[in-house]
Amino acid sequence: MIQSEEDLEYERNVEMFRLKRLIAKLESMKGSGTSMITLIINFKDQINIHARMLAEEVGKASNIKSRVTRQNVTDALTSTLEKLKLYNKTPPNGLVIFCGLVQQEDGGEKMIKIDLEPFKPINTTLYKCDSVFHTEEVRKLLEDNDKFGFIIMDGNGSLFGTLQGSTRTVLLKFNVDLPKKHGRGGQSANRFARIRIEKRRNYLRKVAESTTACFITNDMPNVKGLILAGSAEFKNDLQKSDLFDLRLQPIVIKLVDISYGGENGFNQAIELSSDALKSVKFIHEKKVIGKFFDEIAKDTGKYVFGIKDTLEAMDMGSVDILIIYENLEYNRLILRDANDNIVNETLHKNKCPSGSKYKNETTGVEYEVLDNIPLTEWFMDNYKKYVSHLEIVTDKSSEGSQFLKGFGGIGGILRYKMDTDFDDTENNNEWNDDDFI
């Protein structure tokens, strides 16, 4: 089944958030000595080369004088090698492995073993044996991948470029010699006016044709948005012109007045459009939350919000799009009672047990805690069993902030209308820390 661009965007967003959380965890870990191994394999590299290298490193580790350090490093290298042996060949986007003994809060140590297939190609090869995990190259995967097009035009010429992350690229530039307004009267003035109008029209046609050549690939825009920048009315004339490609008109996100042309104008246009570019990054988030708000405004009954009702709707299989705030303050507990029955509960972080035992305050039943993970992570690992799409949102956009404050940061768009009795405290936005399921 071929996935739509919208489906792929949902999945990319989840993978980005998953990696973001993993990096934060890895960066919080510390080890004693140099027993924490970071191995990054370029997508072009061969697995067996790195397997041989690790085997050689195990041999070298036998020369470490400290018995404890020698054992820790050897264990970490062996664990890394075991992870590597799970792969017959390098995955399409490369491979990242983190292995090593990590210090725990209780003073003990725990062996961490993580293998990661990046969601986009990684071009770096790295091997480090240190007291920390090295995440710098993996963090680069989180950098903004959206590409924006810029058209800089004035009476002297035009420049076409792109901005992707912090990389600025000039695609095309050309000069033009437009006649100035003629000061003399009579027939001469009329003739020069006609020539001037014709040359401006030809210039506009060349800019429009170049715009299509630069920013259309395979019959589709190859940039997320377009910025039209320039002095005078050239940029406005281009946007209004019937020569301007209809496929590009919907992605024009801003018109910018600048004082310069050429590359100086390009730099100025980037600076002056920063707010608009930042806003575009949240377009998908704003669109999904907007759909949720529309269902509520129209009172369709095809919406749900709040921890309790949303999880119940998920269990019934009625949620199409699950929307959650990225920093939900709830955990998902997997519990076992005295009769070996497995029970799931969702608790606010303030109410979560710190040890291996948990007593339900309402029923008085005691449980053994088998697992206790942030609810956001549980959603990321399990959402495909319950819903079509998962959207993880921030509070950076106005819609995201409203969703967090007004609906507790969790809700869903339903496949069909449900008769749901919403909890009064949730309807009144009085979020009860004791709320659990």
From Swiss-Prot:
Keywords: Cytoplasm, Protein biosynthesis
Quaternary structure annotation from Swiss-Prot or TrEMBL: Heterodimer of two subunits, one of which binds GTP.
PANTHER family: PEPTIDE CHAIN RELEASE FACTOR SUBUNIT 1
UniProt function note: Directs the termination of nascent peptide synthesis (translation) in response to the termination codons UAA and possibly also UAG and UGA.
Family (UniProt): Belongs to the eukaryotic release factor 1 family.
Alphabetized NCBIfam families for the sequence: aRF1_eRF1
InterPro entries: eFR1_2_sf, eRF1_1_Pelota, eRF1_1_sf, eRF1_2, eRF1_3, Peptide_chain-rel_eRF1/aRF1, Ribosomal_eL30-like_sf
First-listed, main subcellular location of the protein, grouped into a coarse class: cytoplasm
Organism per entry: Didinium nasutum
GO cellular component: cytoplasm
Subcellular location: Cytoplasm
GO molecular function: translation release factor activity
Highest taxon above the source species: Eukaryota
Protein's UniProt name: Eukaryotic peptide chain release factor subunit 1
SMART domains associated with the record: eRF1_1
Transmembrane intervals: none
